[in-house]
Amino acid sequence: MTVSQAIDRVDRLKPNSFSYADKLVWLGELDGRVKREIIDAYTGGEDKKFTPYAPADAENGEGDRADAELLAEEPYDEMYIHYLCARIDYANCEYDRFNNSDAMFEAAYSAFRNAYNREHDAKTRKKNYW
């Protein structure tokens, strides 16, 4: 799933008044978390590059990267939809809906983390014995 596909899908499922840039930043925060907490903890994680998504007027000059692939692939890409829905609900002070959306996100995030753990070797830590 690409960044623009995730945002378009959320806009269809949960009409909202938040800008494309807001949702882009939220997706960047989540993929940064995925990279830092999950991917980097396993061998080969440093080979997978991640550049945060930023609005087109960002200083990095790369534009919004709307066609960039999100880090979690199918079938785990649903977590992005749940995450954006949760952020929208929280920002709208709809806390009951937020709790539901966040629980769905956490379940999807956990499923991705567990699958990544099964499929990749963990980094070993070097120990000094002196």
Cite the ranges covered by each PLM segment:
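Hydrophobic alpha-helical segments
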Residues: 96-101, 120
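Short helix-capping/linker segments at secondary-structure and domain boundaries
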Residues: 88-98
